[in-house]
Amino acid sequence: MINNQTLARPYAKAAFEYASAANGSDAWSGMLGLAAAVVEAPEVAELLRNPRLTRESKVEAVLRLFADDVDEAFRNFIANLGEHDRLFVLPTVREQFEAYKAEAEKTIDVELETAYELSAEQLETLAAALSKRLDRSVNPRQVVNPALIGGLVIRAGDLVVDGSVRGKLSQLAESLKS
């Protein structure tokens, strides 16, 4: 069975290539966010699953919800998705589009899980060091988790660095067990 990631990939790639060529990545990002929110709404999701409705009527219903918030190229994109009965993958298309966009702009979202709130200066210093290490512009987001005891856990894409006291204690406990 094909999953949503596989179904969404060609649409996300095509949308990103079109948006990049037209210098409209930010606009398409916004329109995809709107479209994803629309199809995730329970009423719309139910409408899209209704086997009695034709693909064309589903596309018309979704496009009516956008009103004038999307351009003609995006309307055609939605029509193409609907023609192939793929409107339900819009949230995944948006995620993949954002990943392509971040890759092109050399940016990365980084989660910094700390035991205590970091000061603005500490956050800035850490972001600068991570930016240099990852060779990307870093968008840091701090999460406070007192269970870490001290230190921090860094999550950037597939990279996870556990420099927390809790992590070190867990490693020590594992080494003592073996």
From Swiss-Prot:
Any coiled-coil regions, as ranges: none
Main subcellular location of this protein, as a coarse class: membrane
One GO location term (cellular component): proton-transporting ATP synthase complex
Membrane topology per record: Peripheral membrane protein
Complex formation: F-type ATPases have 2 components, F(1) - the catalytic core - and F(0) - the membrane proton channel. F(1) has five subunits: alpha(3), beta(3), gamma(1), delta(1), epsilon(1). F(0) has three main subunits: a(1), b(2) and c(10-14). The alpha and beta chains form an alternating ring which encloses part of the gamma chain. F(1) is attached to F(0) by a central stalk formed by the gamma and epsilon chains, while a peripheral stalk is formed by the delta and b chains.
HAMAP family: ATP_synth_delta_bact
Transmembrane segments: none
Gene3D superfamilies (alphabetical): N-terminal domain of the delta subunit of the F1F0-ATP synthase
SUPFAM superfamilies: N-terminal domain of the delta subunit of the F1F0-ATP synthase (SSF47928)
Locations listed in the record: Cell inner membrane
Alphabetically ordered keywords of this record: ATP synthesis, Cell inner membrane, Cell membrane, CF(1), Hydrogen ion transport, Ion transport, Membrane, Transport
Similarity annotation: Belongs to the ATPase delta chain family.
Gene name of the encoded protein: atpH
Name the record gives this protein: ATP synthase subunit delta
Top-level taxonomy: Bacteria, Pseudomonadati, Pseudomonadota, Gammaproteobacteria, Pseudomonadales
